Amino acid sequence: MTSPVAHRPIGGLNAFRILKQFGPLMFLLALMLVFAATNENFLSQLNLFNVARQISITGLIALGMTFVILTAGIDLSVGSLLAFCGMVAAIVAKGGAANTLSLSSNAGQGYGWFAALLAAVLVGTAAGLIQGLAITRLRVPPFVVTLGGLTIFRGLTLTLSGGGPISGFTPGMRWFGTGLVGPVPVPVIIFGAAAVLCHIVLRYTRFGRAVYAVGGNAEAARLSGVRVDRILVAVYMIVGFFSGLAAFVLSARLNSAEAVAGIGYELTVISAVVIGGTSLFGGIGGVGGTVVGAALIGVLVNGLVLNNVSSYTQQVVIGLILIAAVAFDRWLKLRAGT
């Protein structure tokens, strides 16, 4: 007589995996259907272009944040760093000290869009380097270092600008925020190219494998020869770089750099990454999910605005979705027995 063989509930496990992998995409499609049904302007070309541009700016920072969260880190300074890099870019583009620039100053003055772009990404990368070194050399938790960075960069922005905006950029610079290549907005092309590059780096390079290894188990990675501290510094430089790039695109789109730019972006960016399936505990996730997460947040906010939902309620909704995404990730881990 043969004894019955216990089988693992494969169907149920596969259902959980499918839900984790495709859940955000299904939710995004459902949201689009709901908003298309509730507001006739949602699917208009003008609205879709605006949503795509906003998603691209948030998504650029989220790409960098993906690297950080994959190492089980966090960066709360990205919103303030966005404002700081944008202000630096504006000053370089216009030429001169912030307090000498006015809203009516000539758009043709300054050092041009390329110098502004270079300044933004260099400042962002340098900020990431400083924060990464503070985390690895001083052994201060990322939460504390970047929370301090949030305040420091905002203060530097206000000091640099005197609290006022700088606007009136050249058509060449504005093209990066409002231009089209064929039917596609330029920010979408920049975001798409960056997403492809980040995916290749994470999936097909030694550095990418090291990022996952550090997030999975930093001590085991160290024992296997991974230079953990260098990886950690590098990922904070990456998110700093993308914060600078996003700042340049945002300033170009708005034709203005403001000291209050980026407030609340840290929550939006982290939400996009986590909703896309990257675990806050590190080692799990990827670029594809982040792109979907950024799109989901962008569509959600846009749809709520079109349906006259207040900005305060929008923040509540995003916060609840973030909590739900983290709780769901934890539940899946427990379900899988990890």
Set out the residue ranges of the language-model regions.
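Single transmembrane alpha-helix segments in multi-pass membrane proteins
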Residues: A30-N99, L133-V140, G277-G288, L320
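Membrane-interfacial amphipathic/re-entrant helices at transmembrane-helix boundaries
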Residues: T2-A62, A97-A115, V226
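Alpha-helical transmembrane segments within multi-pass membrane transporters and channels
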Residues: A97-G149, V292-G293, I297
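Helix-loop-helix "hairpin" substructures at the membrane interface of multi-pass membrane proteins
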Residues: G112-A120, G124-Q131, P183-E258
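Transmembrane helix-bundle core of multi-pass membrane transporters
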Residues: F114, L138, P142-T205, I231-A234, ...
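Transmembrane alpha-helical segments in multi-pass inner-membrane proteins
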Residues: S243, R253-G319
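Cytosolic-side transmembrane-helix boundaries in multi-pass membrane proteins
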Residues: M1-L33, A37, V196, L223, ...
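Hydrophobic core segments of alpha-helical transmembrane domains in multi-pass membrane transport
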Residues: P24-A37, M65-T66, V121-G124, L150-G155, ...
